[in-house]
Amino acid sequence: MAPRTQKSTSGTPGGSGTPGPDEGPQISPGGTYGLEDVVVGCKAFVQKPDVVTGEMEERKAEILSIREKPKPRLTKKQQAELADKPAPTLEETLEYYVHYCEFNKRLDEWVSGTRLITSRELEWPKKEVTSDKTKRKVIRAGSGATTPSTPLTPTGKGYRGAGASNLLKKAAAQAAKNVQGESGLETPQKRKADSGDTSTAQSIRADSIDADADGEDDENGAVVAMEMLGGNDQQEKDDVATESNGGLTASLNANQGQETFSKKQEIEKLRTSGSMTQSVSEVARVKNLNKIQMGKSEVETWYFSPYPLEYAHIDTLYICEMCLSYFPSPFTLKRHRSKCTLLHPPGNEIYRHEDISFFEIDGRLQRTWCRNLCLLSKCFLDHKTLYYDVDPFLYYCMVKRDDLGCHLLGYFSKEKDSAENYNVACILTLPQHQRAGYGKLLIEFSYELTKIEGKLGSPEKPLSDLGLLSYRAYWAEIIVELLLKTEDEISIEEIAQKTAFTHADILHTCMALNMLKQYQGKHMIVLSDLIISKYTAKRPRKRINPQKLHWTAKNWHRSQLNFGW
């Protein structure tokens, strides 16, 4: 049903204030509003250039954040020339972070005000209603430091610069901590409990980076973002403009059935998983980098990554291909490269075949390099979280060798001691090397390690959409290959022992490919002509040679598994 248009009244261009919770979205006709009226949460039409033809298309997009365009450093002469020019208009000074409706989140981008089409209709955000239970819980929590969120408008009082908003959030966090400290209560760090709803799309849980949950800078200067506490979606939208410094810190829970833990209790209670968070607001951050330059490749980033704040508005971040250090300009990178002596990842080379090598890196021994790797991978993994240290993880980096050194293609990480026998915590092929078969090579290598351990392994669940497609394609390829080579009867257990796949993954793959058939009261695995033809039509890819792998499973001491202290 098409959304209905509300009658116009005073207060909001083209309509009355904000619609009630039971009403449809309020829509203002084109030409009845200006850029100064657009707030976070509105849905407007935006010009988007077509990748192939370059022509401008009109796409409906939701406004997630508003900011002033970053001002470049100017010489005195340039400042004098700029002073003689007329003042820039609102369209030229503001940028809008938009999410294109019905498109993937990785297409979100900053657009200038000139690309917003005010001649088309504008859909206003719905009003969020706070229940009586939530209000009473806020009062009991004594969190007087938190204030109702104010719509983020370019000209209104609710619009603040990034620096001012960050300071206010830090002050609010400190005030909340002081209030609870005076009342003799320990300030809890919120951890959303598992709700059992596995339908929420989440990526492969990622390995972690050193971070206290207080939003302070770590020793490398990387700002660690805090979880946004509270269940108000409007607050999440309003605060998204300054998400590079984390969400609003509070010590209350908006949902009754969720527990809260202090950091110490959290570390004791939770297993050392890669993600360590189930917060929905974790994926609501605004992308802070546009592009990264790594070696010969210039890559557009997909998601937010908590690099230092001073790098948030630069056009391109330059990354050393060997040590993964980051720099704001090509000059500083060139100066670093003249001193950087690293030619390969700082670990043990456990595999070498042709021009491909794998290095094993202990997060406890190479913290700086692993943290830089986590920051880089966060640019391309939506649900990857950087909360705890890298100590409990091993990193297996795939590189391509040439005369200049070893160039990173991708990596996967795994816990040193996984309670659920996960053999992968986070896996990534760098975008500039995707669609070349390296993803399956990483997956195959992880299962070769699992075979040496004598276990059945599986990636950490739930998988992302792309991760599920990659793993399902690999599982199908290996299972079909094994069945075609086997002439005798074979069971699910025998397939698991030969491939190191878990029984659940084998059954999932067989059901997805419609390979399970019932015959005379028994389930049979049947390969259809379509499945066989697809398998034979695939082009050959690089494979792992087990004879070139020199690695033994390790038994970790408890002191080597401690982290977060």
UniProtKB/Swiss-Prot annotation:
InterPro entries in alphabetical order: Acyl_CoA_acyltransferase, Chromo-like_dom_sf, HAT_MYST-type, MYST_HAT, Tudor-knot, WH-like_DNA-bd_sf, Zf-MYST
Post-translational modification: Autoacetylation at Lys-384 is required for proper function.
Compartmental location: Nucleus; Chromosome
Catalytic residues of the enzyme: E460 (proton donor/acceptor)
Cysteine pairs bridged by disulfides in the record: none
ZnF bounds (C2HC MYST-type): 317-342
Motif ESA1-RPD3 motif: chain residues: 367-388
Residues of the MYST-type HAT domain: 284-553
Task performed by this protein: Catalytic component of the NuA4 histone acetyltransferase (HAT) complex which is involved in epigenetic transcriptional activation of selected genes principally by acetylation of nucleosomal histones H4, H3, H2B, H2A and H2A variant H2A.Z. Acetylates histone H4 to form H4K5ac, H4K8ac, H4K12ac and H4K16ac, histone H3 to form H3K14ac, and histone H2A to form H2AK4ac and H2AK7ac. The NuA4 complex is involved in the DNA damage response and is required for chromosome segregation. The NuA4 complex plays a direct role in repair of DNA double-strand breaks (DSBs) through homologous recombination.
Quaternary structure and partners: Component of the NuA4 histone acetyltransferase complex.
The protein's name: Histone acetyltransferase ESA1
Organism: Mycosarcoma maydis (Corn smut fungus)
